[in-house]
């Protein structure tokens, strides 16, 4: 096994590191820099440029210069985030089999292919630095990347000629780099605000163990969004002065983007900067120039809501970890956007302690990835990394209920099985709807995928045993399988494509779960009462039909009337839990005479003992 490199494949910049000689070292690229712009350009001469060379020619070649490709990695074309990206990015985003892709000079490229070109550049530079072939890597992703985004990242590595040993979360990687030498137990928070994504993770480190307690974030919140606020401001000011909508000109838009990014960086050390873009456009009256002063205060007012969004996520993640702010020992700042003074100020004010700036925000994630590479290779001993799944996973069961199989915050890798059954007599197949979220009802959660298990042997409802297994690997990629324990027939699905969750949906699910907790609980109680009533009505009707001759006519009619009354109540969508329970109780009392008659005739069936494994829920 050769050297394993750790790669931080960023939205704006990428970095790489290697673990050798008992320490992690950043690998400089061929240009001598520790970070490489995540930019790919296609020239008119057919040349493909990556990194600094691609960035330098972006203004003159905006439609063929691809940046922020990570923002559409694993996205479906019809998703709102894809439409937002399409408005912001100068290159053409197209639909390829339902997924986002880009078109350059009539040729379609997937985000994986573009990302692979960046990874190839990193791989070649690492080989030049190390003097040997590199074939294996650990690549980092935002903590809230969904399954399809993680899968796409792994595919990009494969295209680049890398065997991706592990996909790990960026803040977890940063914590690994920070906490490797910590002997005393500490609860740390990693605040990771990069070019395109935001993650916040609370971890416990100490004695060579890094354990994630809770994680949250937004895969569509980062430095790009801060830049876009400046772009919108400059374009609006220019339009009010000249009447020209400058954002319709892709070359002018690229110049605006670069100016906005530079202004943001300058305002990290200066209180005011001037944006000067001569000959930005022209109209019938002649050329137009854009000259505008931007103060730090104005920049902060333009981006205040973005900063506050990160603070609200910090609050929820600390709560999810079961901690208070006072229990956080250290706050580690990661990502280039954490250099913004107001970001530091707001985080410090919220946590009420000094921020730890001992790590290089651009390099620490790659360093952590290289340490994980060292762990996998065996060079780093006795280090345990425990990451978690961000949301609960389960399936839809009878009545539209979400039955959880793996709870949010479960340490990965994880594998868990539950046994379900059928909802109808002689049901030949079951449909397994895989869900992700925190709500009680299936329709309020995210559908990840659906598959059918066919060929179930004819049997009364509730008799077949369908074992459903959820298996999340160390990369956070999910596989779900179902097996008929009687026939041995099985089916599985690897969640991918349109099944992924957008981060805004995840955040909305968590918030909705809190807002609707009591309402959801009430609805679930009604559904459970209805399911119990339906089961009793079905079983009693079956027994009555078989043993009616053992009853006098009045008793038989009384039981049948109670069954009919309960069935009418079940059919009433507005029936309350109390009404269902009353009718169920009435039938149970009436059915006692049936039980007595059956016992007297010695025809009673011994109730079948339930398997301890079987969950009292049915699959439609």
Swiss-Prot record:
Keywords: ATP-binding, Chaperone, Nucleotide-binding, Phosphoprotein, Stress response. Coiled coil: none annotated. It comes from the Bacteria. The keyword ATP-binding applies. CDD domains: ASKHA_NBD_HSP70_DnaK-like. GO terms for molecular function: ATP binding; ATP-dependent protein folding chaperone; unfolded protein binding. Transmembrane segments: none annotated. Induction: By stress conditions e.g. heat shock. Residues 591-620 are annotated as: Disordered. Pfam families: HSP70. The modification Phosphothreonine is found at residue 197. NCBIfam families: PRK00290.1, PRK05183.1, prok_dnaK. Belongs to the heat shock protein 70 family. Acts as a chaperone. This is Chaperone protein DnaK. It comes from Helicobacter pylori (strain HPAG1). The gene is dnaK.
């Amino acid at each position: 096994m050769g050297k394993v490199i750790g790669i931080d494949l960023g939205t704006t910049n990428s970095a790489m590191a290697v673990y050798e000689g008992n320490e992690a070292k950043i690998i400089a690229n061929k240009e001598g820099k520790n970070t490489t712009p995540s930019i790919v350009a296609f020239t008119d001469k057919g040349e493909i440029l990556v990194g600094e060379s691609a960035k330098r020619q972006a203004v003159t070649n905006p439609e063929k210069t691809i940046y922020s490709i990570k923002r559409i990695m694993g996205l479906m074309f019809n998703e709102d985030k894809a439409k937002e990206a399409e408005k912001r990015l100068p290159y053409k985003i197209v639909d390829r089999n339902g997924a986002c892709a880009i078109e350059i000079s009539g040729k379609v490229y997937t985000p994986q292919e573009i990302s692979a070109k960046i990874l190839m550049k990193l791989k070649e530079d690492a080989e030049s630095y190390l003097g040997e072939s590199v074939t294996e890597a650990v690549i980092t992703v935002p903590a809230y990347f969904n399954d399809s985004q993680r899968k796409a990242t792994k595919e990009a590595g494969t295209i680049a000629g890398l065997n991706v040993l592990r996909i790990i979360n960026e803040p977890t990687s940063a914590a690994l780099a920070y906490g490797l030498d910590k002997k005393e137990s500490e609860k740390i928070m990693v605040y990771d605000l990069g070019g395109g994504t935001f993650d916040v993770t609370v971890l416990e480190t100490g004695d060579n163990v890094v354990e994630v307690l809770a994680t949250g974030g937004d895969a569509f919140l980062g430095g790009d969004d801060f830049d876009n606020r400046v772009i919108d401001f400059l374009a609006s000011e220019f339009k009010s002065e000249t009447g020209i909508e400058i954002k319709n000109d892709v070359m002018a838009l690229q110049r605006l983007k670069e100016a906005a990014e530079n202004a943001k960086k300058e305002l990290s050390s200066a209180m005011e900067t001037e944006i000067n873009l001569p000959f930005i456009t022209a109209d019938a009256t002649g050329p137009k120039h854009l000259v505008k002063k931007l103060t730090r205060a104005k920049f902060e007012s333009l981006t205040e809501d973005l900063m506050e969004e990160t603070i609200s996520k910090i609050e929820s993640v600390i709560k999810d970890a079961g901690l208070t702010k006072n229990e956080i020992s250290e706050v580690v700042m990661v990502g280039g956007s954490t250099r913004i003074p107001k970001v530091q100020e707001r985080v410090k004010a919220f946590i009420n302690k000094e921020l730890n700036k001992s790590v290089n925000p651009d390099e620490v994630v790659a360093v952590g990835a290289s340490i994980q590479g060292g762990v996998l290779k065996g060079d780093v001993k006795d280090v345990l990394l425990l990451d978690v799944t961000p949301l609960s996973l389960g399936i839809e069961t009878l009545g539209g209920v979400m039955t959880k199989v793996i709870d949010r915050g479960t340490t990965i890798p994880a594998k868990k099985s539950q046994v379900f059954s059928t909802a109808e007599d002689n049901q030949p197949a079951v449909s397994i709807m895989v869900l992700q979220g925190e709500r009680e009802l299936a329709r309020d959660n995210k559908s990840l995928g659906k598959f059918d298990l066919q060929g179930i042997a004819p049997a009364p409802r509730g008799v077949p045993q369908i074992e459903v297994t959820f298996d999340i690997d160390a990369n956070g990629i999910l596989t779900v399988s179902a097996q008929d324990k009687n026939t041995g027939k099985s089916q599985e699905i690897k969640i991918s494509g349109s099944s992924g969750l957008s981060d805004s949906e995840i955040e909305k699910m968590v918030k909705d779960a809190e807002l609707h907790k009591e309402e959801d609980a009430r609805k679930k109680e009604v559904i459970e009462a209805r399911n119990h009533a339906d089961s009793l009505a079905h079983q009693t009707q079956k027994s009555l039909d078989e043993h009616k001759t053992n009853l006098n006519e009045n008793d038989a009619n009384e039981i049948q009337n109670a069954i009919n009354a309960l069935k009418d109540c079940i059919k009433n969508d507005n029936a309350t839990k109390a009404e269902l329970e009353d009718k169920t109780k009435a039938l149970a009392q009436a059915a006692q005479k049936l039980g007595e008659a059956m016992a007297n005739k010695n025809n009673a069936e011994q109730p079948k003992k339930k398997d301890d494994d079987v969950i009292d829920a049915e699959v439609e």
